[in-house]
Structures are given as C-alpha cells and as structure tokens.
Amino acid sequence: MKLNELGNCKGATRNRKRVGRGIGSGTGKTSGRGVKGQKSRSGVSLNGFEGGQMPIYRRLPKRGFRNFFAKNYNEVSLGRIQLAVDTGKLDIGKPVDIIVLKEAGIIRRLKDGVRLLSDGELKAKITFNVSYTSKAARIKIEKAGGRVIVPEAV
C-alpha cells in the first residue's frame, strides 16, 4: 500500500445531494425546503430564535459570576509523589515545592500553587513547601516522618 492509494473507508462518505435540478430529480424547484417563509430563504440560521416563543436564554435568570481573583492550584496526591520517589524521579533530600514537582514531571503546568491531597500512601520522609494540604494528607506526611511548610498569605 502506498500513500497515493489511501482513501476513505467504505461507507465513510456520502455523495452530495444535488438540489434544484428539475422535477424528475425529486429535489427540484424548492429543493426540499417547502414553500415560502423565512426558512426557505438563503442565509437563514437564527441561533436562539424559537419562532417567537420566549427563548431559553431569556427565560432563565442570570446566575453567578467569574471570580478573577480565584486561585487555581495544581492538585497532587501523596500516592503520585510516592510513585515518583519509587521510580527515582523525585529527590527526597531537599524540600519539595512546585518547581521540584514540575521538574520531576508530576505536574505539567505551573499554576498558582500546589494542593496536596491524601490519596494513596506515603512511606518516604519528605519536607513539603506547598500552598495547601488537606488534614488527612498532613497526618500521613507527619506519620511518615516528614513535615509540611505552608507559606503565610500576604
């Protein structure tokens, strides 16, 4: 098989419907659009128009807003950190912070901080320098002999 022999699978494409080609074709004259009216004209597509009925976007009340000051955190589970320690991606000799987690490949994109969650088990003794930890995660870290440093909010 060569690149020039590639084609669509059988049944993947459908022939174009040729409309307006005489009475005998079955789709002549009005081309399947019926007779007169707004929807028979070209260029009609009224998004949100429901035929004069009050549209849904006006029937429902306005709700909520977007908080531009909201912090967006990278959520990391303890199990994921233990896996990185086991595979040798994470050095436990120095404190673990957002940059160390990024370099280890545990988080992909740097956000406003790191949020530690308690999913999984942690056996390694690690010092964490993160924005937030859940109570259960903090207990597991301290039980393993590690500690958590949470910087104070400015």
From Swiss-Prot:
Instruction: Reply yes or no: does the keyword Nucleotidyltransferase apply.
Output: no
Q: Which InterPro entries does the record associate with it? A: Ribosomal_uL15, Ribosomal_uL15/eL18, Ribosomal_uL15/eL18_sf, Ribosomal_uL15_bac-type
Please list where the region (Disordered) is annotated: 1-44
Molecular function as annotated in GO? rRNA binding; structural constituent of ribosome
Q: Which Gene3D superfamilies match?
A: 3.100.10.10
Q: Which GO terms describe its biological process?
A: translation
Keywords, in A-Z order: Ribonucleoprotein, Ribosomal protein, RNA-binding, rRNA-binding
Q: Which GO terms describe its cellular component?
A: cytosolic large ribosomal subunit
Q: Which Pfam families match?
A: Ribosomal_L27A
> Key word RNA-binding present in the record?
yes
Give me the stretches of Gly residues compositional bias.
Answer: 21-35
Give the UniProt family note.
Answer: Belongs to the universal ribosomal protein uL15 family.
PANTHER family membership: 50S RIBOSOMAL PROTEIN L15 (PTHR12934), LARGE RIBOSOMAL SUBUNIT PROTEIN UL15M (PTHR12934:SF11)
The entry describes its oligomerization and partners as: Part of the 50S ribosomal subunit.
Q: What job does this protein perform?
A: Binds to the 23S rRNA.
**What is the protein name given in its UniProt record?**
Large ribosomal subunit protein uL15
